[in-house]
Amino acid sequence: RDIGYWRDKQGHEIDFVINQKGRPLLAIECKWADKDFDPANAKVFLKHYNKAQVYVVSHNVSRPYSRRYDDFTIKFINLAGIENICKFQWGQNTQLLKNLKELPGKH
C-alpha cells in the first residue's frame, strides 16, 4: 500500500492518492468547505486513472453525499468518513487509521 499525492506537468494536483494492490486508486481532496471544491483537477486525474474513486473531505459535511460532474461522480465525506473507507479497504488495524487517531483535535 502506498500513500502519496498526484501532480501533473500542468499543475493539476490531488492531495492524497492511496494505492493498494488489487483495489482501485483512492483519490482524496481536502477542503475547508465542500462548496470550495472545483472538480477540474479530479477530471484530469480521472482521465489518467478512470477506475479511481474520488473523495472530497470537508469538516462541514454532516452526511456523506455524491455529486455528479459531467461523466464522473465525486463522494463528499467528513474526517470520520475517511476512517470508514480505510476500514472497508484494509480492515481495522491499519497504520493509516492509527495515524488518523493520533492527530490532535476532535475526531
Give names to the regions the model predicted:
Residues 1-107:
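A cross-kingdom feature that marks ATP-driven nucleic-acid transaction machinery
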